[in-house]
Amino acid sequence: MIRAHFQFKETITTILAEEQAWIEVAKEAMITARQDLERYIARDPFFQMTLEPYTPDHGPSIAERMAGAAGGAGVGPMAAVAGTIAAIGVGAMARAGAAFGVIDNGGDIALITDRPLRIGIYAGTSPISGKVAFVLPPQPAVYGVCTSSATVGPSLSFGVADAVTVFASDPSVADAWATALCNQVRPGVSTAFDSLAGSGVDGAVAILGGEVQRWGSVPPMVSATVDENLITAGELY
Protein backbone atom coordinates (compact mmCIF):
# COMPACT_ATOMS: atom_id res chain seq x y z
CA MET A 1 0.00 0.00 0.00
CA ILE A 2 1.16 3.52 -0.82
CA ARG A 3 0.57 6.35 1.66
CA ALA A 4 0.97 9.86 0.23
CA HIS A 5 0.67 13.28 1.83
CA PHE A 6 -0.87 15.81 -0.55
CA GLN A 7 -1.50 19.48 0.08
CA PHE A 8 -2.99 22.04 -2.29
CA LYS A 9 -3.55 25.37 -0.55
CA GLU A 10 -5.83 24.69 2.47
CA THR A 11 -6.68 21.19 1.25
CA ILE A 12 -4.40 18.91 3.29
CA THR A 13 -4.86 15.19 2.72
CA THR A 14 -3.47 11.72 3.20
CA ILE A 15 -4.12 9.38 0.28
CA LEU A 16 -3.94 5.58 0.48
CA ALA A 17 -3.89 3.46 -2.67
CA GLU A 18 -2.36 0.33 -4.16
CA GLU A 19 -0.86 2.10 -7.17
CA GLN A 20 0.79 5.49 -7.64
CA ALA A 21 -1.30 6.10 -10.75
CA TRP A 22 -4.46 6.14 -8.66
CA ILE A 23 -2.93 8.63 -6.26
CA GLU A 24 -2.11 10.93 -9.17
CA VAL A 25 -5.67 10.60 -10.49
CA ALA A 26 -7.01 11.59 -7.07
CA LYS A 27 -4.70 14.60 -6.84
CA GLU A 28 -5.75 15.87 -10.26
CA ALA A 29 -9.44 15.49 -9.48
CA MET A 30 -9.14 17.31 -6.14
CA ILE A 31 -7.16 20.17 -7.66
CA THR A 32 -9.71 20.60 -10.44
CA ALA A 33 -12.62 20.54 -7.98
CA ARG A 34 -10.98 23.05 -5.68
CA GLN A 35 -10.18 25.39 -8.57
CA ASP A 36 -13.78 25.18 -9.78
CA LEU A 37 -14.95 26.09 -6.28
CA GLU A 38 -12.49 28.98 -5.97
CA ARG A 39 -13.68 30.48 -9.26
CA TYR A 40 -17.28 30.21 -8.12
CA ILE A 41 -16.58 31.79 -4.72
CA ALA A 42 -14.82 34.68 -6.46
CA ARG A 43 -18.14 35.67 -8.05
CA ASP A 44 -20.36 34.58 -5.14
CA PRO A 45 -18.39 35.16 -1.91
CA PHE A 46 -21.49 34.74 0.25
CA PHE A 47 -21.37 31.02 -0.56
CA GLN A 48 -18.18 30.79 1.49
CA MET A 49 -19.27 33.08 4.32
CA THR A 50 -22.77 31.91 5.19
CA LEU A 51 -23.35 29.51 8.07
CA GLU A 52 -26.88 28.75 6.90
CA PRO A 53 -28.23 26.69 3.98
CA TYR A 54 -27.68 28.43 0.66
CA THR A 55 -28.63 27.71 -2.95
CA PRO A 56 -25.81 28.37 -5.44
CA ASP A 57 -26.53 30.49 -8.49
CA HIS A 58 -25.47 28.28 -11.42
CA GLY A 59 -22.54 26.94 -9.43
CA PRO A 60 -20.19 24.14 -10.47
CA SER A 61 -20.87 20.54 -9.51
CA ILE A 62 -18.80 20.74 -6.32
CA ALA A 63 -20.77 23.77 -5.09
CA GLU A 64 -24.08 22.05 -5.83
CA ARG A 65 -22.99 18.91 -3.97
CA MET A 66 -21.83 20.89 -0.95
CA ALA A 67 -24.96 23.02 -0.82
CA GLY A 68 -27.30 20.06 -1.21
CA ALA A 69 -25.71 18.13 1.63
CA ALA A 70 -25.39 21.15 3.90
CA GLY A 71 -28.96 22.24 3.28
CA GLY A 72 -30.25 18.92 4.59
CA ALA A 73 -28.17 19.33 7.74
CA GLY A 74 -29.15 22.96 8.28
CA VAL A 75 -25.62 24.36 7.94
CA GLY A 76 -23.68 26.47 5.45
CA PRO A 77 -22.17 24.88 2.31
CA MET A 78 -18.56 25.13 3.50
CA ALA A 79 -19.42 22.61 6.23
CA ALA A 80 -19.26 19.98 3.49
CA VAL A 81 -16.19 21.15 1.58
CA ALA A 82 -13.61 18.70 2.91
CA GLY A 83 -15.79 15.62 2.54
CA THR A 84 -16.86 16.66 -0.94
CA ILE A 85 -13.31 17.22 -2.18
CA ALA A 86 -12.27 13.85 -0.72
CA ALA A 87 -15.26 12.16 -2.37
CA ILE A 88 -14.36 13.64 -5.74
CA GLY A 89 -10.83 12.31 -5.39
CA VAL A 90 -11.93 8.80 -4.42
CA GLY A 91 -14.58 8.80 -7.14
CA ALA A 92 -11.85 9.48 -9.69
CA MET A 93 -9.80 6.61 -8.26
CA ALA A 94 -12.76 4.25 -8.56
CA ARG A 95 -13.41 5.25 -12.17
CA ALA A 96 -9.73 4.59 -12.92
CA GLY A 97 -10.15 1.02 -11.68
CA ALA A 98 -9.13 1.16 -8.03
CA ALA A 99 -10.88 -1.25 -5.67
CA PHE A 100 -9.19 0.34 -2.66
CA GLY A 101 -8.64 4.02 -2.03
CA VAL A 102 -8.81 6.31 0.98
CA ILE A 103 -8.57 10.08 1.19
CA ASP A 104 -8.42 11.66 4.64
CA ASN A 105 -9.03 15.38 4.25
CA GLY A 106 -8.41 16.69 7.75
CA GLY A 107 -10.54 14.05 9.46
CA ASP A 108 -13.16 13.88 6.72
CA ILE A 109 -12.64 10.56 4.97
CA ALA A 110 -13.94 9.27 1.65
CA LEU A 111 -13.09 5.71 0.70
CA ILE A 112 -13.68 2.59 -1.29
CA THR A 113 -12.36 -0.66 0.10
CA ASP A 114 -12.38 -4.33 -0.84
CA ARG A 115 -11.33 -5.36 2.68
CA PRO A 116 -12.24 -4.49 6.28
CA LEU A 117 -10.67 -1.19 7.25
CA ARG A 118 -9.78 0.14 10.69
CA ILE A 119 -10.28 3.85 11.27
CA GLY A 120 -8.74 5.18 14.46
CA ILE A 121 -10.48 7.68 16.71
CA TYR A 122 -8.67 10.85 17.75
CA ALA A 123 -10.70 12.96 20.16
CA GLY A 124 -8.27 15.36 21.77
CA THR A 125 -8.10 15.06 25.55
CA SER A 126 -10.90 12.49 25.81
CA PRO A 127 -9.70 9.34 27.63
CA ILE A 128 -11.02 7.36 24.66
CA SER A 129 -8.81 9.18 22.17
CA GLY A 130 -6.19 7.03 20.47
CA LYS A 131 -7.43 3.83 22.11
CA VAL A 132 -10.35 2.81 19.89
CA ALA A 133 -10.94 2.20 16.19
CA PHE A 134 -13.98 1.57 14.00
CA VAL A 135 -13.84 -1.60 11.88
CA LEU A 136 -15.53 -0.67 8.62
CA PRO A 137 -16.66 -3.58 6.41
CA PRO A 138 -15.78 -3.61 2.68
CA GLN A 139 -17.36 -0.73 0.77
CA PRO A 140 -17.45 -1.25 -3.02
CA ALA A 141 -18.91 2.22 -3.62
CA VAL A 142 -17.61 5.56 -2.37
CA TYR A 143 -18.40 5.94 1.34
CA GLY A 144 -17.95 8.72 3.89
CA VAL A 145 -16.63 8.66 7.46
CA CYS A 146 -16.40 12.27 8.59
CA THR A 147 -15.46 13.73 11.96
CA SER A 148 -15.96 17.16 13.46
CA SER A 149 -14.56 18.43 16.76
CA ALA A 150 -15.16 21.43 18.96
CA THR A 151 -11.88 20.89 20.82
CA VAL A 152 -9.42 19.77 18.11
CA GLY A 153 -8.31 21.62 14.99
CA PRO A 154 -9.06 25.02 13.46
CA SER A 155 -12.60 24.43 12.15
CA LEU A 156 -15.38 26.67 13.44
CA SER A 157 -17.69 24.91 15.89
CA PHE A 158 -20.38 26.08 18.30
CA GLY A 159 -20.34 22.85 20.30
CA VAL A 160 -18.44 21.08 23.05
CA ALA A 161 -17.85 17.57 21.66
CA ASP A 162 -14.35 16.16 21.43
CA ALA A 163 -15.40 14.29 18.29
CA VAL A 164 -18.53 13.53 16.31
CA THR A 165 -18.13 10.91 13.59
CA VAL A 166 -20.81 10.35 10.97
CA PHE A 167 -21.14 7.43 8.54
CA ALA A 168 -22.97 7.86 5.22
CA SER A 169 -22.85 6.64 1.64
CA ASP A 170 -22.36 10.26 0.55
CA PRO A 171 -19.24 11.83 2.12
CA SER A 172 -20.70 15.30 1.57
CA VAL A 173 -23.68 14.34 3.73
CA ALA A 174 -21.40 12.78 6.35
CA ASP A 175 -19.30 15.94 6.53
CA ALA A 176 -22.25 18.34 6.77
CA TRP A 177 -23.96 16.30 9.48
CA ALA A 178 -20.75 15.88 11.46
CA THR A 179 -20.56 19.67 11.64
CA ALA A 180 -24.23 20.07 12.50
CA LEU A 181 -24.21 17.43 15.22
CA CYS A 182 -20.97 18.71 16.72
CA ASN A 183 -22.69 22.06 17.15
CA GLN A 184 -25.64 20.44 18.92
CA VAL A 185 -24.63 17.44 21.06
CA ARG A 186 -24.29 17.95 24.79
CA PRO A 187 -23.27 15.61 27.64
CA GLY A 188 -26.10 13.42 28.86
CA VAL A 189 -28.48 14.56 26.11
CA SER A 190 -29.01 12.60 22.88
CA THR A 191 -31.82 14.63 21.31
CA ALA A 192 -29.43 16.07 18.69
CA PHE A 193 -29.72 12.74 16.87
CA ASP A 194 -33.50 13.07 16.48
CA SER A 195 -33.12 15.00 13.22
CA LEU A 196 -31.11 12.23 11.53
CA ALA A 197 -34.09 10.10 10.50
CA GLY A 198 -34.35 10.21 6.70
CA SER A 199 -31.16 12.25 6.37
CA GLY A 200 -29.10 9.68 4.48
CA VAL A 201 -26.88 9.15 7.51
CA ASP A 202 -26.27 5.51 8.43
CA GLY A 203 -24.89 6.10 11.91
CA ALA A 204 -23.20 8.59 14.20
CA VAL A 205 -21.00 8.57 17.29
CA ALA A 206 -20.36 11.51 19.62
CA ILE A 207 -17.50 11.56 22.12
CA LEU A 208 -17.70 14.06 24.97
CA GLY A 209 -14.92 13.41 27.44
CA GLY A 210 -15.47 9.83 28.59
CA GLU A 211 -19.07 9.71 27.36
CA VAL A 212 -19.96 8.00 24.07
CA GLN A 213 -23.33 8.58 22.39
CA ARG A 214 -24.42 6.43 19.43
CA TRP A 215 -27.17 6.57 16.83
CA GLY A 216 -28.10 4.26 13.97
CA SER A 217 -25.86 1.66 12.38
CA VAL A 218 -22.30 2.15 13.62
CA PRO A 219 -19.38 -0.14 12.69
CA PRO A 220 -17.89 -2.21 15.52
CA MET A 221 -15.54 -0.32 17.83
CA VAL A 222 -12.45 -2.23 18.98
CA SER A 223 -9.47 -1.51 21.19
CA ALA A 224 -6.57 -0.07 19.21
CA THR A 225 -3.39 1.92 19.53
CA VAL A 226 -3.75 4.88 17.21
CA ASP A 227 -0.49 6.31 15.87
CA GLU A 228 -0.93 10.08 16.09
CA ASN A 229 1.89 10.50 13.56
CA LEU A 230 -0.52 9.21 10.92
CA ILE A 231 -3.05 11.98 11.54
CA THR A 232 -3.31 14.23 8.50
CA ALA A 233 -1.64 17.56 9.19
CA GLY A 234 0.13 20.31 7.33
CA GLU A 235 0.95 23.99 7.26
CA LEU A 236 -1.30 26.69 5.87
CA TYR A 237 0.24 29.57 3.99
UniProtKB/Swiss-Prot annotation:
Domain of life: Archaea
Signal sequence coordinates: none
Family note: Belongs to the UPF0280 family.
Protein's recorded name: UPF0280 protein Mpal_1292
Lineage, highest ranks first: Archaea, Methanobacteriati, Methanobacteriota, Stenosarchaea group, Methanomicrobia
